[in-house]
């Protein structure tokens, strides 16, 4: 392979690509496990009373979900750095765009977690009171859920911009099959469009299509970088 007319060191490039591929797939697996533990990146319907009861029933499970979320956010930032090292020489400007926005994505989600962790204590307090006394704790939980959802939407806009920049590099550099890059472009546009509209119309469901395309893109690019790079 060549990078800006020069020969790329084979071993460093393979290492960068393999680690990037692993992180793509690792992040997807973490999201699945987090969902199974009750940690949701985004909620469409708010039922804080039911959520607080569920959290208080098994707080350790909820804690584990948050800890895995912290690992996921850190992995997003690590992936961004590895992709920048491996691919930015093909287009440094687009490389700077994706490292800014995808690092921003990870940092925005980190900001959520201290408040989300508070739900464990809120759930405990909620269980100790009855009647109207529950309302204040329920309202506080609802506020935390809404704040998290809003921040998540901004994180997804960062994902969209960063992934669009990365995908354009994939299409123009011929490092991977162009179809993968085009899939990333489609996914990033759909996610950005759907998320932007949902900020205005919360009941808008089109972002699900973008999410499916985004997952498909990350599975394919992750698998290609992890396995094809070492063949």
Question: Where are the regions a protein language model picked out?
Answer:
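Hydrophobic, aromatic-enriched alpha-helical segments typical of multi-pass transmembrane helices
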Residues: 2-231
């Amino acid at each position: 392979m060549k990078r800006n007319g020069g020969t790329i060191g084979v071993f460093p490039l393979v290492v960068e690509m393999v680690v990037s591929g692993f992180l793509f797939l690792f992040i997807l697996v973490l999201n699945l496990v987090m969902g199974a533990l009750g940690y949701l990146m985004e909620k469409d319907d708010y039922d804080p009373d039911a959520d607080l009861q569920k959290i208080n029933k098994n707080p350790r499970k909820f804690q584990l979900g948050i800890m895995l979320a912290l690992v996921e956010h850190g992995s997003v930032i690590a992936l961004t750095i590895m992709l920048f090292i491996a691919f930015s020489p093909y287009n440094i400007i687009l490389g700077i765009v994706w490292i800014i926005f995808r690092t921003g994505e990870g940092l925005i989600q980190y900001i959520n977690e201290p408040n989300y962790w508070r739900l464990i204590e809120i759930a405990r307090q909620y269980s100790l009171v009855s009647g109207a006394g529950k309302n204040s704790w329920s309202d506080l939980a609802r506020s935390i859920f809404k704040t998290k959802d809003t921040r998540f939407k901004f994180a997804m806009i960062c994902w969209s911009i960063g992934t669009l920049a990365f995908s354009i590099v994939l299409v123009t550099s011929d490092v991977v099959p162009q179809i993968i890059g085009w899939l990333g472009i489609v996914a990033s546009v759909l996610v950005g469009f759907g998320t932007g509209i949902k900020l205005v119309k919360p009941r808008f469901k089109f972002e699900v299509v973008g999410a499916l395309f985004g997952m498909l893109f990350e599975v394919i690019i992750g698998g290609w970088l992890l396995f094809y790079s070492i063949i």
